From Swiss-Prot:
It is found in: Virion membrane; Host membrane. This is Glycoprotein. The record marks 78, 180, 428 as: pH sensor in the pre-fusion state. GO terms for cellular component: host cell membrane; membrane; viral envelope; virion membrane. Residues 491-529 are intravirion. The keyword Glycoprotein applies. Glycans are attached at residues 181, 340. Belongs to the vesiculovirus glycoprotein family. Residues 259-313, 388-410 are annotated as: Trimerization. Gene3D superfamilies: 2.30.29.130, 2.30.30.640. It comes from Piry virus (PIRYV). The gene is G. Residues 1-18 form the signal peptide. GO terms for biological process: symbiont entry into host cell; virion attachment to host cell. Homotrimer. Interacts with host LDL at target cell surface.
Length: 529
């Protein structure tokens, strides 16, 4: 099935008076960090589109903006067993290899390493020196714990940490497991009272039919930071001693529920939330449920997972591939780019943004509202082949700026969007350090290294490299032959160099004995002669 006709329908953006509405980070620069292997986050799909002829009312309310910004400082604690293996063959050669093994750090390991990191005394000693024993395979081991800064997102309503690196996308403790079994995440500061945070004024647009009864099923809501959300599941809920609306995506906004929409109070339109209802702001917020939207979600998800498959296979990526990882709706999400051949990610808040077209000479647009004056959208660029790259495949060719996702949505693609560059993840958090301390002619690999003194494994090791084994056997045979010839040569020379007198004495003794023998046999005459 050809995906491009579908993409034209799926990715078409809203057009207002010749301008495109897209979603884009609300900051010009982000905090980037390398993507570790096993990360496969895919964003929520495009928002539902509602009838634009409906009446609209602007509701002014407040939403929490977090005790911290949209990201939180913290550290990833990596632990690994660094192994130097010496394979000392019985016939002489030594084979030295190095490997790094996954090892889950303990709380005490990370606390000690973090304190050393803050003191500036945390160092990487590298691989231990080899220890070799004849005809055996010997491992020298060293446990290394490293700490690296890592920002995560924050759920403003529950205080949970959110990041694709966490199993399930979130963590509520101060010692968080990650999808990488040799790494854990530790926050820089402890969580405080969630209600002590500040609340930001937000304008939420409520749309509804111009005629007919006002019931919750006929409402829809959206803002600069929120996708279009149906009102069927909206309910009234208290948060931090304030009344407000809990929306379909799980988020909440405080407002006066006694104000009216078309002479009907909000409290009379929407029901109270049932006991136990949770409000949340994660990377996986819920959305509307319709057949068309679900089909779109499946297509978006398959394109996103196809990009992650390429990342797992360490294939080069194009700007178009990166664009499939970007969110399609406003709100919290992840951004991706390529830095020095390595895939990086960052937490971002996506806001509705209006641009002139998918390809522009200046990277400017209106953030939040269509009527806002254009402003600079992005200023952080990284090398990508002959071009520069920003978030989610945004390409700077030197002459123009291209948004791949929105160009292909309009059926416009060119060779620039297919420019390839390396964008591999980090296989192991300590691999870059290993390469910096290991000679280039040595080998780094994962898995079990070294064997015990099992004789079967030992013999198998002898013939692991048949060319060297054959040469060694030939050398041993030649050594035996040369040794044998040397011994024979010494014996022959020894015989040749013995004095002649000894042989004469033997002959005289032999003649005398023969004469005595004849005399005893009765031949004296013969003896006298």
């Amino acid at each position: 099935m050809d995906l491009f006709p579908i993409l034209v329908v799926v990715l078409m953006t809203d057009t207002v008076l010749g301008k495109f509405q897209i979603v884009f980070p609300d900051q010009n620069e982000l905090e980037w960090r390398p993507v570790v292997g096993d990360s496969r986050h895919c964003p929520q799909s495009s928002e539902m589109q509602f009838d634009g002829s409906r009446s609209q009312t602007i509701l002014t309310g407040k939403a929490p903006v977090g005790i911290t910004p949209s990201k939180s400082d913290g550290f990833i604690c990596h632990a690994a067993k660094w192994v130097t293996t010496c394979d000392f063959r019985w016939y002489g050669p030594k084979y030295i290899t190095h490997s790094i093994h996954h090892l889950r750090p303990t709380t005490s390991d990370c606390e000690t390493a973090l304190q050393r990191y803050k003191d500036g005394s945390l160092i990487n000693l590298g691989f231990p020196p080899e220890s070799c024993g004849y005809a055996t395979v010997t491992d020298s081991e060293a446990m290394l714990v490293q700490v690296t800064p890592h920002h995560v997102g924050v759920d403003d309503y529950r205080g949970h940490w959110i990041d694709p690196l966490f199993p399930g996308g979130e963590c509520s403790t101060n010692f968080c497991d990650t999808v990488h079994n040799s790494s854990v995440w530790i926050p820089k500061s402890q969580k405080t009272d969630i209600c002590a945070q500040s609340f930001k004024n937000i304008k939420m647009t409520a749309s509804y039919p111009s005629e007919g009864a006002l019931v919750s099923d006929r409402f829809a809501f959206h803002s600069a930071y929120h996708p279009n959300m149906p009102g069927s599941t909206v309910c009234i809920m208290d948060f931090c001693e304030q009344k407000g609306l809990r929306f379909t995506n799980g988020e909440w906004m405080g407002l006066n529920v006694e104000q009216s929409i078309r002479e009907k109070k909000i409290s009379a339109i929407f029901p109270n939330c049932v006991a136990g209802t949770e409000i949340r702001a994660t990377l996986e917020s819920e959305g509307a449920r319709t057949l068309t939207w679900e089909t779109q979600r499946m297509l978006d998800y398959s394109l996103c997972q196809n990009t992650w498959d390429k990342v797992s296979r360490k294939e080069p990526l194009s700007p178009l591939d990166l664009s499939y990882l970007s969110p399609r709706a406003p709100g919290k999400g992840m951004a991706y780019t390529v830095i020095n051949g390595t895939l990086h990610s960052a937490h971002a808040k996506y806001i509705r943004t209006w641009i002139d077209y998918g390809e522009m000479k200046e990277i400017k647009g209106g953030r939040g509202e269509y009527s806002k004056a254009p402003e600079l959208l992005w200023s952080q660029w990284f090398d990508f082949g002959p071009f520069k790259i920003g978030p989610n495949g945004l390409l700077h060719t030197g002459k123009t700026f291209k948004f791949p996702l929105y160009l292909i949505g309009a059926g416009i693609i060119d060779e620039d969007l297919h420019e390839l560059d390396e964008a591999a993840p980090i296989d192991h958090p300590q691999m870059p350090d290993a390469k910096s301390v290991l000679p280039e002619d040595e080998e780094i690999f994962f898995g079990d290294t070294g064997v015990s003194k099992n004789p079967i494994e030992l013999i198998q090791g002898w013939f692991s490299n048949w060319r060297e084994s054959v040469m060694a056997i030939v050398g041993i045979v030649l050594l035996i032959v040369v040794t044998f010839l040397a011994i024979k040569t010494v014996r022959v020379l020894n015989c040749l160099w013995r004095p002649r007198k000894k042989r004469i004495v033997r002959q005289e003794v032999d003649v005398e004995s023969r004469l005595n023998h004849f005399e005893m046999r009765g031949f004296p005459e013969y003896v006298k002669r």
